[in-house]
Amino acid sequence: MTFQHAGVIGAGAWGTALAQVCARAGLTVTLQAREPEVTASIAAERENTLFLAGVKLEDAITASTDMAALAGCDLILAVPPAQHLRSALTALKPHLKPGAPVVLCSKGVEQGSLKLMSDVAAEVLPGAPIAVLSGPSFAGEVARGLPTAVTLACEDEALGRRIGQALAIPTFRPYWADDVIGAEAGGAVKNVLAIACGIVEGKGLGRSAHAALITRGFAELTRLAVALGGKSETVAGLCGLGDLVLTCSSPQSRNMSVGLALGGGQTLEQALAGKVSVAEGVASAPAVRALAHSLNVETPICEAVAAILAGEVDVDSAILGLLSRPLKAEV
């Protein structure tokens, strides 16, 4: 059976970009938005002027604020902010077509419960087939048709490959993996590390420090993924290392831009002011820190970011703390 009708929950930049991918892959697409102005601009101008201005949307995409509009969809892509995934899936539940797979595209750790997105989905939608999509992908580039490759993680290989085939176009290549946990851990932790890289850039600490931070951050990401039950090989791929390198290397990254502002002397409130899109790392940092503590996993960079965001320490003191750590073997 092939998929015909995709429903995308969340009409932010990434949700809109994924709607473009689905439409270009030949699917009919219903894009569910919280904001009436988004559905109005898509209907009138074929453009999401709030979150993805300047990108004309495919004709196969229709938008609605009503979750019931997804009732006939045989494939769901869930793309709300990570901290809103539970409420979004709860709203979807009475309208979810039996057997329709839910592809989780939100990256983060839920505050309070410290659960990964797949655990949240399993609680809200017991029995629903779940997959995870993650990888190096800026929304604007994907929406404009620039090429990338991503990980499509699903424990059911046959289903994972079917979903990958349904979403595949020449400029968007999903690679199947069976390690859902590894794929999720990579996506959640890299957002926190991107804030750290932004701070390094904002403080003018140089390219050497930037490269060292990405490398040591990747070690933290890997340790946490393995402690959660993921595979180191998974996070060495697109959903971990690939996503990390992209997110930590460009001010296009919402998380890195927050770090740049913090490194430049702004407060967190100033860094977030005027942003319509969510920097997931801000909400995930305290959850990642708490999760690492619960698993007894050492994550000093993530710890420092969480402390800065919580106002427990200033940027300069956090940097000094990292540079003053005892020397140890690299591996």
Curated annotation (Swiss-Prot):
Record EC number: 1.1.1.94
Binding sites annotated in the UniProt record for NADPH: 14, 34, 107, 139, 254, 278, 280
Entry superkingdom: Bacteria
PROSITE patterns cross-referenced by the UniProt entry: NAD_G3PDH
Enzyme class (EC, first level): oxidoreductase
Record flagged with keyword Nucleotide-binding: yes
Pathway: Membrane lipid metabolism; glycerophospholipid metabolism
Keyword check for DNA-binding: no
GO CC list: cytosol
Keywords of this entry: Cytoplasm, Lipid biosynthesis, Lipid metabolism, NAD, NADP, Nucleotide-binding, Oxidoreductase, Phospholipid biosynthesis, Phospholipid metabolism
GO biological process: carbohydrate metabolic process; glycerol-3-phosphate biosynthetic process; glycerol-3-phosphate catabolic process; glycerophospholipid metabolic process; phospholipid biosynthetic process
Molecular functions per Gene Ontology: glycerol-3-phosphate dehydrogenase [NAD(P)+] activity; NAD binding
Annotated binding of sn-glycerol 3-phosphate, by residue: 107, 135, 137, 190, 243, 253-255
Subcellular location per the Swiss-Prot or TrEMBL entry: Cytoplasm
Catalytic residues, chain numbering: 190
Catalytic activity: sn-glycerol 3-phosphate + NAD(+) = dihydroxyacetone phosphate + NADH + H(+); sn-glycerol 3-phosphate + NADP(+) = dihydroxyacetone phosphate + NADPH + H(+)
Stated family: Belongs to the NAD-dependent glycerol-3-phosphate dehydrogenase family.
Known role: Catalyzes the reduction of the glycolytic intermediate dihydroxyacetone phosphate (DHAP) to sn-glycerol 3-phosphate (G3P), the key precursor for phospholipid synthesis.
Protein name per the record: Glycerol-3-phosphate dehydrogenase [NAD(P)+]
